[in-house]
Amino acid sequence: MRHGKVHRKLNRTAEHRKAMFANMSASLIKHEQIVTTLPKAKELRPIVEKLVTLGKKGGLAKRRQAISEMRDIDQVKKLFDVLAPRYKDRHGGYTRIIKAGFRYGDNAPMAVIEFVDRDVEAKGQDSGPVQNEASEAA
C-alpha cells in the first residue's frame, strides 16, 4: 500500500533531494523561469509556493526559515523584497508548469516551470562568469 507516500524519491537520497530542490528553488527565484524534467518540476512547485508564502508573511523568523530552506541569502532577499510584493494580492498559484517535449538523449519528459507575471528580463540574468565578462566588456 502507498499510504502516506506523497513525494517522489527521484532516485536520490534524502540529502541529495533536499540539496537539489534548494538549488532549483534558488535558480527559479533568480531567473524566474527554468527548464527541468517534468517530475522534478512537479515536486519543485509546492516548495516554491511555500517559499513565496513565507516571503509574503515577512518578518525575521520567516526570512531565517526561508534561508534554511534555500541556503542562498541573495535569493531570499529577492524573494522578500521583489516577489512577495508582486504577489501580495494573489492567494497561491504563483508558478506554472508548461510541458516542453522530450529530451533528446534519454527521451525524458521536459517542462518549463516559471512564475506567473514573471519579469521577462530576469531570465538568464547574471548566469555566471561568462555572461558577467560579456556584459562588462560591452
Curated annotation (Swiss-Prot):
SUPFAM superfamilies per record: Prokaryotic ribosomal protein L17 (SSF64263)
InterPro entries membership: Ribosomal_bL17 (IPR000456), Ribosomal_bL17_CS (IPR047859), Ribosomal_bL17_sf (IPR036373)
Signal peptide limits: none
A family per Pfam: Ribosomal_L17
PROSITE patterns: RIBOSOMAL_L17 (PS01167)
Subunit (UniProt): Part of the 50S ribosomal subunit. Contacts protein L32.
Protein name: Large ribosomal subunit protein bL17
Key word Ribonucleoprotein present: yes
Sorted UniProt keywords: Ribonucleoprotein, Ribosomal protein
Gene that specifies this protein: rplQ
Example of a GO biological process term: translation
One GO CC term, this protein: cytosolic large ribosomal subunit
Entry similarity comment: Belongs to the bacterial ribosomal protein bL17 family.
Gene Ontology MF terms in the entry: structural constituent of ribosome
Domain of life assignment: Bacteria
Species annotation: Nitrobacter winogradskyi (strain ATCC 25391 / DSM 10237 / CIP 104748 / NCIMB 11846 / Nb-255)
